[in-house]
Curated annotation (Swiss-Prot):
Protein name: Ribose-5-phosphate isomerase A
Binding annotation for substrate: T33, G34, S35, T36, D89, G90, T91, D92, K102, G103, G104, G105, K129
Record's GO cellular component terms: cytosol
Keyword NADP: no
Gene: rpiA
Organism: Jannaschia sp. (strain CCS1)
Active site: E111
Subunit structure: Homodimer.
C-alpha cells in the first residue's frame, strides 16, 4: 500500500503517475534509468495492462529493459525506432533553468543519446533534487578504460582553470571493483560542489581524450514534474513558461512500487 512507502518514495510515485499522462497510445517512449524511472516504467505497465495501450519503449539500460519487459512494455532498440515521441527520466539535480545533472545510476551516455533523439523530454523528481546552482551532486563522466588514470589527471588539471569549488575526481566502484557501464566503460565522479558555468564545463570535458560523455543535461528538459509526499505535483513547462500545481489521486490499495523500492 502507498501508506507503507516513505515520504520520498511517495513523492517519486506521484511524480511518475503524473508524468505518464503525457504518454499516448502508439507512442515510442524513452525509458530512463534509476529508482524514480523504475516507478515510471511500472506506471507504463499499468497503462498497457489496464487500458490496453500500445507503447514501444527504448530503454537506457539493461535493468530498465528487463523491468519494462516484466511489466508488459514492448522494448526495442533506438536503431529499430530511429526517433522517439517522448522520453521520461529522473534526475540527480535540477536548477531553476531545468538544467540537470544525471548519471547517478550509471547510464548517462544512453540517457543522453535517447533524450536528444526525442521530441520531448519529461523529467520526474522530488523536491530534494532542486538546487540553486548545479554541482552539489557529483558530476559523472564516462571514460574509456584505456588510460583512465591519465584521463582523470587531465580532467583535474582542466578543473583548476574553471569556476568550480571542488576539483577532485574519484573512480566509481561497485563493491571492490570498478563500476562498468553497459558499454563497458568507467565512470569518474567529479566533486565540484558548485558549477558556475555548466555549458563551458560540458564543452571542455568532452574535448578531453578518453572522455565519452558527461552528466550535464543542458537545454534538454522540456517539462519537470516534481512530486510531493502529500500527492501534490508541480509541473514546470519551460517551453510554455508555465508552472502548474495539481493533485494526483493515489488509492491506498495501490502497491505497484512496494517491491521496487531501493
Amino acid at each position: 500500500m502507498t501508506a507503507e512507502l516513505s515520504p520520498i518514495d511517495r513523492a517519486k510515485y506521484v511524480a511518475a503517475r503524473r508524468a505518464v499522462e503525457y504518454v499516448e497510445d502508439g507512442m515510442r517512449v524513452g525509458l530512463g534509468t534509476g529508482s524514480t524511472a523504475a516507478w515510471m516504467v511500472r506506471c507504463l505497465g499499468e497503462l498497457v495492462r489496464d487500458e490496453g495501450m500500445q507503447i514501444t519503449g527504448v530503454a537506457t539500460s539493461t535493468r530498465t529493459a528487463d523491468l519494462a519487459r516484466d511489466v508488459g512494455v514492448t522494448v526495442k532498440t533506438l536503431d529499430d525506432v530511429r526517433w522517439l515521441d517522448l522520453t521520461i527520466d529522473g534526475t540527480d539535480e535540477y536548477d531553476p533553468n531545468l538544467n540537470l545533472i544525471k548519471g547517478g545510476g550509471g547510464a548517462l551516455l544512453h540517457e543522453k543519446v535517447v533524450a536528444t533523439a526525442s521530441d520531448q523530454m519529461v523529467v520526474i523528481a522530488d523536491p530534494t533534487k532542486q538546487v540553486d546552482t548545479l554541482g552539489a551532486f557529483p558530476l559523472p563522466v564516462e571514460v574509456i578504460p584505456f588510460g583512465w588514470q591519465t584521463t582523470k589527471a587531465l580532467i583535474e588539471e582542466m578543473l583548476s582553470n574553471l569556476d568550480v569549488l571542488g576539483r577532485s575526481a574519484s573512480l566509481r566502484l561497485s563493491g571492490a571493483e570498478p563500476f562498468r557501464t553497459d558499454e563497458g566503460n568507467l565512470i569518474l565522479d567529479l566533486h565540484l560542489r558548485r558549477i558556475a558555468q555548466p555549458a563551458q564545463l560540458s564543452l571542455v570535458l568532452n574535448q578531453i581524450p578518453g572522455v565519452v560523455e558527461n552528466g550535464l543535461f543542458l537545454d534538454i528538459c522540456d517539462v519537470l514534474v516534481i512530486g510531493n509526499a502529500d500527492g501534490t505535483v508541480e509541473v514546470r513547462d519551460i517551453n510554455n513558461g508555465t508552472i502548474e500545481h495539481e493533485r494526483v489521486d493515489v488509492a491506498e490499495t495501490d502497491n505497484l512500487f512496494v517491491e521496487v523500492k531501493e
